[in-house]
Amino acid sequence: ILVNWGGGFPTPEIVGNVDNQNLHALKDIEYVVVTNPEFVYQAKDLAEFHQKEDGMNVAVVTTDQVYNEFSSGTPDPTAIRAFMKMLWDKASKSEYGVYPQYLLLMGDGTYDNRGILKMNDNNKILTYQSVKSLNETSSFSCDDYFGYVEDGSFGYNNLYTNKRINIGVGRFPVSKAEQAENLVNKVKQYYALGPGEWKTKVLALADDNDEQNSSSGYHSFSTHQEEAITTLE
């Protein structure tokens, strides 16, 4: 044992305050908005709009709140899924429980969750990365991960085979407050326009491979997905 008789105990450094929170108290939430703290104002604006127009119970929470309560303060995409599963499980245990139906992530994402490439403008909300990272056609980021919350609904291969996602998941890929405000306004405009022929038009985009006969499977996969979408009635 080495003892430094001339030293002293370290002095704790005060970093800041942590506000009290209790996300576990939430219940009967139909629409959840998980937002980067930079876009709280826009997220609350959208929540109030849906509450008024659709009569839904909407909750707005920040990524910091989710991480604090579901991953001990460590940024982790699984914390978002754990939060949604908590809401789902709470509804399943109640005779008249309201299940969460929609999850909106307000903030851009990137494959570089650890920030190694210093793409701060893109890394607003962490993404889930597929476990098959060594295969070019099976490696991807997918927000569907956050919507598989029912017991037994998610496993190693479920993102490839399971089509029964429990919660609809969307993302506003915004990096600035102005972008978030623009997308919120687009939602409001969508409601204001009402029904019409414009709602029957779909734009389908698909990537392809430069070498169409390549064994990589890029071309056939992308083309088949595009054709499947365009045949929907």
Regions found by a protein language model. Give the residues of each.
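Cysteine-dependent hydrolase recognition
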Residues: 1-233
